[in-house]
Amino acid sequence: NVITVDNLDSTKNHISKYELFSYVLGTGFYSMFIGMITNYKSDYVNNIIKLNETNQQILNVIVALLGFVVGFGIMVFIDNFHGKRGKFRPIALISAIPMGLFGFLMFYTPFSNANTWQAMFYLVAVNVIYNGLVTLTATANSTAIVMTPNEKERNSLLSTNGFFNSIMQSAPLVIILIFGFFQYKYDEDGNITSGHYSKNTMYIIALALCAILYVAFMTNAMLKVKERVPYNEKKNSPFEGMSHVVKNKNFWFLTL
């Protein structure tokens, strides 16, 4: 079966200005949120919670292994998902709030010592869930492909969206610079001379702001946009594709 819409005229424009504006803002603040976590995660781990090198290696290995399994399952789910209101939009909408929450938890560790097994369990769980949610919420970017059957309009949407997203990826730097003015300043003896909060608190406030903006604008965007390009409801087995890869002699040549 094929999902159809009333009008699939590929010669006219389908996206309203408000729909375009809402979508670009939603994905823009998504890029800002992701950029905040990506750019400052290393500083948070090394200088705020002070996770030692061994535990960082353990964390990275476990998260990578579990992330592969979880990510594979999520990709299968997305590939076979076909909702009444679209393929990508419902997933991006439902996963927005959990993404905001676990993205925030990436910079919030409720343990005085991160180098304990309890804290490591917490960090692994948060990182794995967050990475899984990144895969789910990335469907917001895929939504642009099915918003219009008009190729020219689609290309214009993708170009506008890409340009704004590239700008918003740098927004966390501005946010950190602004909040940094109110961070504690210390003298040579380590005494606080000015400021209102620590660097840890600054990160928490900045990420909370990014999370709230992302959830608000992405939710609005996914409620406003429409998927207008039909798609096939046939479910494909991921193992069929994997079998073709395994049987390919070039795959084994490159692997070995």
Describe the role of every protein-language-model region:
Residues V2-L256:
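Membrane-embedded alpha-helical bundles of multi-pass transporters/translocases
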